[in-house]
Structures are given as C-alpha cells and as structure tokens.
Amino acid sequence: MITCDAHMHTRFSEDSDASVHSMLDAAVNKGMQAVCITDHLDKDFPETPDFPAGAFMFDLDEYFSRLTQLKTEYQKKLEVRIGVEIGLQPHLGEYYKELTEKYPFDFVIGSVHLIHGQDPYYRGFFEGRSDEEAYREAFQVTIENLKKIDSFDSLGHLDYVVRYGAHQAEAYSYRKYAEEIDEILKHLISHGKGLEMNMAGMKYGLGFPNPHPDVIRRYKELGGEIVTIGADAHRSEHVAFDYEQAREILTGCGFSYYAEFKGRKPVFRRIVP
C-alpha cells in the first residue's frame, strides 16, 4: 500500500477551488498517513483563455501560516507537509533558488507547464505541427530547463504533454523519444533528483500515469531510486486517485519502495502489498 499523496492543489492554486480541509479529510478517508500540499507557483505564466497573466502566484506567508495551523490540527490523524509545485522556465533559475532558500518547504516539485511560452493544455500549442513534433519539443524544453534550474526535488509529470495531443498516446512511446528521455533521466539521477509518478494521467484517459511505466522502468535501469507519487488532485474526490493501480505499476517497474520528502530530504517507504 502507498500511504502518501505528495501532489495536491487547494484554493491557493488558481485552478482549484478546494479547501485545504476538504483535501485533508479526503486523505484521511482514503487511508493516507501523510500528504504534501503542493500548490502551483508558476512565475511569469502568460495570459490564457482561462486565466490572466500571473495568475499562478500566491502569498507564501499566508500559505505557510495556514498550513502550519493545519499541521497541528491534523497531527493525530495525518501528517501534513508543506510543499510547492514550481513551473520551470529557463530564465527563472535564480528566482526559484532564492525562493526555495527563503521558505522551509518539505518538498518542491519542478514541472514543465510551458513550452516556449505556450501551455499544451490549449490546442494552439499543437497548431501547425504533429503530435510527434510537439512531444519532442516538450522533451527538448525539459532538458533546457533542467540545465538551468536545480531548486527542486522531483520532476513532475514528465510526458505531461501527451495528455493533450490530438491522438494522445498514439504518437508516443519511450522508444520513439529514447534519446531525449534518457538525457532527462540521466540528469535527474546524476543530480540526485526524483521522478514523480503522477496518477492524473489515469483520469485523463491515457491508461497510464505520467510518465509512462516504460519511462519509470528505464529510470530504474539507469540507476534511479527516488520515485515520488502523487494524484495531482485539484478536487477532494481525486486525492490518492487510483492508488491501488499505482502500487501495481511501481512494483511492476521493479521498485519495492517509493520516496516521500520531509525537509527536502527523501524518506523511503517500502511498498506493502
């Protein structure tokens, strides 16, 4: 059993209306022993059809104050950790370095939500190119980000772009992008970074988490050991989403343990059948 959901969003994220209480109560009801709140902090996020420019920023002092209160309130039934999901862009390396040194996060997820200033969530990103071209560009941009930014603990939802392609996984396999993906995985391993298994891919109809199990398996083959797990829930009903399947996938990739982060340090938990 996996007993920690290390990726979830609350009202502090522009794209979630969920109260922190609702997410924590859902975690307790799902049998979680720990959670990490990881609200979106995407500096320099552009205007989109749904959000104004700069929408994915929030008051970190208020965030820490509120979550610290809830750590105490829930301490007898759930360990509450304070994290953040930062949106990687190559020019933000120094900004995120200063931010993560200033605030005592337990866990920092680094995620690529923008590809040369465009969010693949919107169809405009795919106009004039094939899914294959778009996916390859996303991996190349991820490599560029990793070379510029070191202030995170685990890479969030690698292959996220596949969720939004016109044909989703039809144009995607590890083998097709092995050169780019291997460069990403080798960088993570050599820099002591984790790889997130993000279960949101299951609810987006992909039939697999992000990244694909073949990528997780390759991470292990290359010597990777730090796999974090999160549902990427923005609503309480998605907390610990499809976690039984998560256990089966991770063990099928050769892992007998997963990682949680406390104080920016990995803690390894054995996967209990």
What do these predicted regions represent?
Residues 1-86, 90, 94, 99-102, ...:
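An N-terminally biased module of ancient metal coordination in phosphate/nucleic-acid-related enzymes
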Residues 1-10, 20, 31, 116, ...:
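Charged catalytic cores and adjacent phosphate/nucleic-acid-binding surfaces used
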Residues 24, 59-73, 79-81, 98-104, ...:
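Histidine/acidic residue-rich metal-binding segments in metalloenzymes
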Residues 33-40, 105-115, 153-160, 196:
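Non-cysteine beta-strand/loop elements that form the S-adenosyl-L-methionine
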Residues 98-99, 122-124, 271-273:
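Short, surface-exposed amphipathic charged segments that create phosphate/polyanion-binding patches used
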Residues 121-134, 162-173:
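Surface-exposed cleft-lining segments at the edges of enzyme active sites
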Residues 157-166, 192:
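Active-site rim beta-loop-alpha module in soluble metabolic enzymes
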